[in-house]
Amino acid sequence: PVPTTERHLLQPREPSRTFGERQRSGSSPPSPKIGILLYRKHVITKQPYIPQLIKRFEEAGLIPLPIFINGVEGHVAVRDWMTTDYETQQREQGNKETLSLSPEAGKVDAIVSTIGFPLVGGPAGSMEAGRQVDIAKGILGAKNVPYIVAAPLLIQDIHSWTRQGIGGLQSVVLYALPELDGAIDTVALGGLVGEDIYLVPERVQRLIG
């Protein structure tokens, strides 16, 4: 697909569509739906790990709902474009914590961020992560589903990772900052090989297993 907006649902084997359009396109099997946050830049540059990751989710019997974002609006995608059974129940009881929730929001059973960094502000919010924690926790608390950060290493190649472990700055991006928001079970999915990002199959299996 050729993305033309800053935030959109991605389906590699068919044209991009909104959550609502995809959900109305047919009956969904009773499989867990996983919201996945992806870098828009990586979608545009056709990084090979994105279709590989989505395919692995599908092969595991999961329904991926991938959204590409610029990085700084991850909290908007989670807050407005994703909903859950818990949030639906709360809204039916009059507890509308997220007034900006889209009527076409996709219902998910878990959320996976392949970006790292704080949920609110992304890379731009790293220096103010502590100040935004309450906002992030409020957004995630309204959804009340697992929030997992499973990101490839964007500033470290696979060779150095396997030999020396995850570097200091990369560790902050992948572990420390997301954990402030309440992320659980962080997984490093892969890393750089030249200019491209590749997945490590064993790490992907840990995520979806």
Which residue ranges define each predicted feature?
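An N-terminal assembly and electron-transfer interface module characteristic of large anaerobic redox
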Residues: 1-209
